[in-house]
């Protein structure tokens, strides 16, 4: 009994101090310059009164371009187990909620876009990309608002989609069953992708130029 109490108190203090350090994170603080990563952000209340941001991030992503004639689409995926929030208990809960045992990969497949749409996005610096997000064996139609910018010769795609756990039919993650932290039904999906890391893009550009 005393050992269980010590474990509980240790977890409480750990998450308490973690919450003090992770309040109100913006996307610029989540991703480092030059990273090729994805993340989620949600909000939780720690010990009933401390509001804190929770961020789970992965840089183990696969991004590739698929072409059909002059049209292209983009496929981005990552293993659920690669999401890291800095708290093992929370990450294990997320793995269970997202059914990682049976469907270990989350994948987004965009709709096909034309070359004119790509050029327009690069010129304007903003676009919306529609497609399907595959999570836990289910598919969800999504519309991602994105920004495109060039940094030191590298094009970067960033974006934030505001949604909720209930939109995906998911339970809310909780630390120690909600004793330590309760998560709100709020979810941000964050994108920070380097176009030079998108497989097949350079080959498609070279082929287009040669034609």
Where are these regions (language model features)?
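Low-complexity, acidic/polar, glycine-enriched regions of mature
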Residues: 23-211
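Generic alpha-helix initiation/capping and coil-helix boundary signal
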Residues: 3-4, 15, 56
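Intrinsic disorder/low-complexity segments enriched in polar/small residues
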Residues: 3-4, 22-24
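Bacterial N-terminal signal peptides
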Residues: 9-21
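Bacterial N-terminal signal peptides that target proteins for export
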Residues: 1-9
